[in-house]
A protein has these predicted regions:
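Intrinsically disordered, low-complexity regulatory segments enriched in Ser/Thr/Pro
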Residues: 36-72, 117
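Acidic, proline/glycine-rich low-complexity IDRs
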Residues: 3-18, 33, 46-51, 59, ...
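Short, surface-exposed tryptophan/glycine-enriched loops
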Residues: 71-80
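N-terminal interaction modules that seed assembly of large macromolecular complexes
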Residues: 19-46
Length: 119
């Protein structure tokens, strides 16, 4: 699954790097019938104390989402998603460029985000 995620993210970043803004966030969505998706956004603002920092979108992949089906609960999906993103931030094509942003995070759009790195 990581390979497909990395291909999706590489394609997005090939077309859009450098992303505008100061921080990045991976929005995770629960779709229907155990389908899940991830959207990349960049934000004009970052403050770890402000839980809405990722609402200040400067860039978004919009409907171009990474999607998959998996029969597990949302907690496991959050773990799996963060693990894929951390792996990309370690070995992905744009890992070093993404880590130049103030922070990178991931989380469900209706919940808290997990800070994956800070600069």
């Amino acid at each position: 699954m990581y390979d497909e995620f990395a291909k999706w993210l590489d394609r997005i970043l090939d077309e859009n790097m450098p992303l505008p803004g100061v921080a990045i966030n991976f929005n995770i969505y629960e779709e229907v019938d155990l389908h899940w998706s991830i959207q990349l956004i960049s934000s004009t603002y970052f403050d770890e104390e402000d839980e809405d920092w990722n609402c200040y979108e400067e860039f978004t992949t919009g409907e171009d989402l990474y999607e998959w089906q998996q029969g597990v609960g949302w907690e496991k999906i959050l773990d799996i998603s963060c693990e894929m993103i951390r792996k990309y931030l370690t070995e992905g094509k744009y890992a070093e460029k993404l880590k130049k942003y103030e922070a990178g995070a991931a989380g469900f759009v209706d919940g808290d985000v997990e800070i994956l790195y800070r600069r």
